[in-house]
């Protein structure tokens, strides 16, 4: 009998694209029902008290990274959100594939970084977390580049 492959579901895209809204819908599907959900924004708010504090955000990112690698090691199904603008995330997808994870990538994006900036501003005015405009713009283009690189280099299932 063949061992069940663990599943990694990544919801990726630039800041302010709607990753969390998309993830909330995906978490209702049968194939994610037993998955651990790792979200650095939630970790910053719930465990370190403030998602607008640079120190809390840094601690949350470190904890989320640790949790992701533990899931790989223990072969646990999991879902995580990422801006997908760092090379580390590309390496992580490769490691998951090497560990025989079934990888699904849902890429959420708007048609321009200006739209993302407006969405983030509205989110902040409604009590959410902010992201500096310069980071929104640079991450927007880097995440698109990384999506094209992962699609070319790794047989994944992007949506």
Locations of regions flagged by a protein language model:
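Phosphate-binding P-loop
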Residues: 1-5
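Conserved substrate/cofactor phosphate-moiety recognition/catalytic segment
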Residues: 24-74
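Conserved lysine of the Walker
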Residues: 19
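A glycine- and Lys/Arg-enriched "phosphate-lid" helix/loop adjacent to the NTP-binding pocket
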Residues: 101-146
